[in-house]
């Protein structure tokens, strides 16, 4: 029990005994040691989205990590040049070649500011369309999953959308069996508005949220 004191019995040495209370140095404070809470969560990661120049997209699509890192503003790990992400990089490379201005919007690097490491990719599918809609996408390197990076990336994308005056609506398309992504998106007010067929991913459910909702919810949180 915190604050309790442990009192030692007086030594009984022939010819030497302490009557009454023992000397002060014989009383020791007892402090309780609280075990670490296994359920305690680490603080959320702090990330930013780092945009990539067009040639980096092409190098990653070709699986050339060395060439990509020679041009990238941040260091990229091997998974970025893996076959799993090659299709995304190829699509973005072609998109930026046709519309160089889209490079400021499309897929970038999820960069952990504290760890100084690239943990995934995130961005918009392109600039806002005439109605003010942007569609977001994000994916985390398997080595860094289940650490809060998907949430951090989603919040970074929503925060930028809220700041951009031409953006009115944020969209995300999720496969019906991707419950983890649905659960995360639903926490930020995304509501189902339809469905679509993607040639690569198959059936997807379309969810949208007002771009200003995230900024409003942040400003209403207590300090």
Feature names for model-found ranges:
Residues 8-12, 16-135, 160, 164, ...:
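GNAT-family acyltransferases
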Residues 164-173:
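Conserved GNAT acetyl-CoA-binding A-motif
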Residues 2-8:
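Extreme N-terminal basic, low-complexity initiation segments
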Residues 116, 148, 178:
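Conserved G/P- and acidic residue-centered "switch" motifs that form tight phosphate/ATP-binding loops
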Residues 156, 173-174, 197:
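Proline- and acidic/polar-enriched loop/turn elements at helix boundaries
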Residues 172-182:
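Conserved beta-strand-loop-alpha-helix junction that forms the acyl-donor binding cleft
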Residues 138-140, 146-160, 183-187:
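Conserved acetyl-CoA-binding loop-helix of GNAT-fold acetyltransferases
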Residues 111, 137-146, 174-175:
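A short, internal acetyl-CoA/4′-phosphopantetheine-binding micro-motif in the GNAT/acyltransferase core
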């Amino acid at each position: 029990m915190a604050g309790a004191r442990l009192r030692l019995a007086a030594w009984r040495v022939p010819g030497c005994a302490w009557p009454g209370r023992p000397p002060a140095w014989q009383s020791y404070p007892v402090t309780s040691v609280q075990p670490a809470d296994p359920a305690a969560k680490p603080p959320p990661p702090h990330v930013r989205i780092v945009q990539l120049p067009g040639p980096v997209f092409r190098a990653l699509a070709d699986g050339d990590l060395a060439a990509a890192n020679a041009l990238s503003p941040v260091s990229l790990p091997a998974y970025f040049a893996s076959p799993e992400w090659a299709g995304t990089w190829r699509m973005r490379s072609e998109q930026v070649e046709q519309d160089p201005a889209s490079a400021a919007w499309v897929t970038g690097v999820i960069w952990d500011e504290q760890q100084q490491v690239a943990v995934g990719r995130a961005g918009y599918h392109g600039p806002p369309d005439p109605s003010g809609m942007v569609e977001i996408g994000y994916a985390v390197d398997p080595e860094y999953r289940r650490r809060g990076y998907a949430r951090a990336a989603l919040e970074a994308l929503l925060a930028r959308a809220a700041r951009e005056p031409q953006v009115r609506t944020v969209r995300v398309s999720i496969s019906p069996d991707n419950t983890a992504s649905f659960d995360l998106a639903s926490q930020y007010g995304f509501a189902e508005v339809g469905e679509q067929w993607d040639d690569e991913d198959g059936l997807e459910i379309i969810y949208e949220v007002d771009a200003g909702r995230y900024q409003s919810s942040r400003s209403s949180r207590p300090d």
